[in-house]
Amino acid sequence: MIKWGTTFGSHDGALAVFVDDELVFASDAERWSRKKNDPIIPDRLIEFAENKWGVPEIVYFYEDLNLKDERRKFAGQKPLDELFFKYPITYCNHHESHARYGYYTSPFIDCTVLVIDAIGEWNTMTQWKVKDGDFTLIEKWDYPKSLGLFYSAMTQAAGWKPNEEEYILMGASAVTQNYNIHDYQYIKSMWNNNKSFHQGIDLEGLTDEFEIAAIAQDIYEEEFQKIIDKIDDENLVFVGGCALNVSANRFLTKFNTYIPCNPGDGGSAIGCALDHKIEPNPYLGYEIAGEYPVTEIIKELKENHMVGVAKGRAEFGPRALGNRSLFADPSILDMKNKVNKVKGREKFRPFAPMILKEDVNTFFEKGISSPYMNTVRNATHQTQQLYPSIVHLDGTSRIQEVTEDPHRTLLEEWKKETGCPMLLNTSLNIKGEPIVNNEKDVKKFEIKTDVKVL
C-alpha cells in the first residue's frame, strides 16, 4: 500500500511517502520549487513520487481545516481559500501530527511529548503523556496565547520575515544584552496581557533590531522555562516550530531529550501518516549518486579551506547534516567572515561544528544530545581560542554530533591528518535560497559562489 503524508497551504510544504508502512521518502517543497519556505507542493515533486513509487491509495493532511476556519473567524481573519490537491485528502489534527512524528521517531516507549508552535487549529502549546503508543492530552494553550506567534511578531518588528527568518532573530539576540529595561517591561506586558500577536506588534519607536531580538529571546526563554519546569518525566520529546529555537533548548538538560530533524510543520508530513515506531533518519530526500568523497573533501579543505558536498540523499528539514553541506576549516581565524561572504549572510550569524560524539565533552560543556543541530552548548575556553569560527557571540555553539558513516570516517580522517577534531558545517545555499537539492542546483551554486562542490 502506498500512502502519502502532506503539509501545504500555509508555509513549509512537504511530502512524505510510505510503501507498506515503510517511510521511503520525505522532502520539503522548497527544495523542488526553489522558493524559500514554499507552502505549495510543486508538480515536479508530486511527479517524482508518482514515477518512483506509484500513485497513493490514501493521502493524509497535517491539520483540520474546519477547526482552523473556526479559529480564523474568531480572530477576525478571512476564511481559508479552498485547498486543491491532485488526490482526495484525509484531514488530521495539527498538534497530533507534530506529536506523532516526534514520538514515533524517538527512542522512548513512555515519555512526555511537548509541542510548541505559532498555532495549529486552536492549540499553540500541548503536552501529551504517551505510554506504549497511547497518547493522552494533559496540558494545552489555545489561541491567542502563543509563544510562537509572539516570536514571529517580534521577528517582523525587528525587520525580518515572520514564519521564515525567526532564526535570524535568534542569532541576533546574542549581539547585545544592554537593552532598556523599560522596553523589556513594555513588551513583557503585552505577553502578560495575552495580546493577540497574529497581526504583528507595535513597539512604539523601538527600532534597534538587536535590542528587539535580545528582549524577544529573553522573554521566550523565561516562558519556556516555566513550561518545562512543570513537566514531571525523565523522557521528553520536543516538537513544533519552537523546537528550532536551539538557544532555548539548552534548558532541557534535566530530561532525556529527543528533538527530531524536522520538528516544524514540514515534519508533520511524516507525523500525520505515521502510526508506528520507525528509526530516525534525516537522509530521506533526493539522491545524488556516488561514493561519499572523503579523500577529495579533505584535499580541498587543506588546499582551499572550504568545499561544498552534495552526495547521497538530501536531508529532510532545515539543517544540512553532511550531504548538502558547505564545509570549512574552523581553525582558520577569519573563516566565519569568509563563509558569510560566500553565503551573503549577516556578519553576526553563527556557524555549527560537526564533531564526533565522543569528542563533544572535550570541547563543549554539558548539554543535551544534538545529532541534528538541535541545541547549543557553551564552548570551552580552549575551543573559543582554537576554533573561533564555530563559536557564537555568546560563547555557544550549535553542535552536530556524529556517530555514523560516512561523516564519521570524514571526521576521523580529517582529525588524523590535521589534528582538528571538527569541521565548520553550514548549509549548501546562499541567503534567501533553499538548500541545494539536485545536480542542477549544484552547478548553479558553483557558478554563483566560485566554490567547488564534490
Residue spans of the language-model regions?
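Extreme N-terminal starter segment of soluble prokaryotic enzymes
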Residues: 1-4
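Flexible beta->alpha loop and helix N-cap segments adjacent to enzyme active/binding sites
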Residues: 7-36, 51, 66-68, 72-192, ...
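Active-site pocket-shaping loop/turn-to-helix segments
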Residues: 30-40, 214, 218
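Phosphate/pyrophosphate-binding loops at sites that engage ATP/ADP/AMP, CoA/4′-phosphopantetheine
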Residues: 44-58, 227-234
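Short glycine-rich phosphate-binding loop at a beta-alpha junction
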Residues: 54-66, 233-241, 308
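Active-site cores of enzymes that catalyze phosphoryl transfer or operate on phosphate-rich substrates
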Residues: 171, 177-218
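Secondary-structure capping and boundary motifs in well-ordered enzyme cores
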Residues: 208-212, 216, 220, 240, ...
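Phosphate/ATP-binding catalytic cores across multiple sugar-kinase/actin-like superfamilies
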Residues: 214-236, 414
